[in-house]
From Swiss-Prot:
UniProt keyword annotations, A-Z: Cytoplasm
Entry keyword Oxidoreductase: no
Family affiliation: Belongs to the sulfur carrier protein TusA family.
GO molecular function, one term: sulfur carrier activity
Protein source organism: Haemophilus influenzae (strain ATCC 51907 / DSM 11121 / KW20 / Rd)
Name of the protein this chain belongs to: Sulfur carrier protein TusA
Length: 79
């Protein structure tokens, strides 16, 4: 996949559920539609929670790297 232009990076390393998703929600609110938030996490629950959050809140999970920590998620605000 080509390079994704990230608007903001959110480091949630060391945080455990539900903190990473709460911070994603708080930070993505400040982005405009189409802007991209890169989330870096090491909580295994994020592999389930972040895709579910995107679906529920109508954001787009562009790409994720979840083979081994730290996990990375590129989330575009909106569809």
């Amino acid at each position: 996949m080509s390079e994704i232009s990230v608007t903001q990076t959110l480091d949630t390393l060391g945080l455990r559920c539900p903190e990473p998703v709460m911070l994603v929600r708080k930070n993505i609110r400040h982005l405009n539609d189409g802007e991209i938030l890169l989330i870096i996490a090491d909580d295994p629950a994020t592999t389930r929670d972040i895709p579910s959050f995107c679906q529920f809140m109508d954001h787009t999970l562009l790409q994720c790297e979840v083979e081994k920590p730290p996990f990375k998620y590129w989330v575009k605000r909106g569809k």
